[in-house]
Amino acid sequence: MNEENVMNILHSNREKLEKYKKVIRLAIVTTMICVCGIYYLYMNRHVKFQDKNMAYEISRTIGPNVNPENVKYKDVYAIKELNIGQLGKYDTLEDIKLCKNLVRISVNGGGDKWNSLETNDDVLIVTNKKAETFQKELADLIPELKRLKRFAYSNYCRNCDISDFSFLSECRQLEILRICYSDTTDFSFLKSCKKIVDIDLQESQIKDADDLKSLKNLETICIYDTRLSKDETEVESLCKAFPNAKIFISEDKVQNIDIKEE
């Protein structure tokens, strides 16, 4: 094979290589356009809610003039905070999973302004059977909120008691926790929530400081009206474990800080 033939073959191979590169580039661009198109269509689909009252609550969170029929996936994915109020309003909590990027969630009035409940008729009582269903749903839904940093629950009106919060052990990003007016006695899940800095357990059934002391980064602790707050030995051990934390024992007693400075 002479030199000219060799050069022709090399030139031909280069042309083929360039053609292959163009085909590959075109395929990549086409794929990206298709992926973007599919993503756009998905995000702009209308959401189908399972519970009409949750649909209303989520729509109201998105904006004051938003109707459930107009809510799209891009809208629910943008929600960072959700306060669903009394659980008695709902048949199911499944729609919470639509808000997959939640950072803060309040359940059964955790964070509600309860003075808006003017009479007992405003309180929606949940049966024990329904409360068990809600507990199972929360156990499935809450750990899936991978960005969740604040969880709040209150049974202030004694209308729906969630007695098992072990599902929170999977919420490793939690920084703020509120479990108030609850009959739960098991707080062992706290050992897995290493990032918590602020915890409020007022009117809960916590009886000793052991589980709290497993949290090394606590800055604020509220144990109003708990068995723990009435045990001076346990309170002293808690103060020793967190010498720089604000520890709220009762409305007129705060440990580790000068109340006058507040």
Kindly label every feature range from the protein language model.
Residues 63, 77-141, 147-167, 173-185, ...:
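Concave beta-strand-loop units of leucine-rich repeat
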Residues 31-41:
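Hydrophobic alpha-helical membrane-insertion segments, chiefly the h-region
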Residues 14-32:
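N-terminal Sec-pathway targeting helices
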Residues 42-68:
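Surface-exposed cap/linker segments adjacent to membranes
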Residues 2-6, 54-55, 135-138, 235:
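Short amphipathic alpha-helical segments that mediate assembly, nucleic-acid/protein binding
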Residues 71-73:
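Short, structural beta-strand-to-alpha-helix junction motif
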Residues 1-20:
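N-terminal Lys/Arg-rich, disordered targeting/topogenic segments
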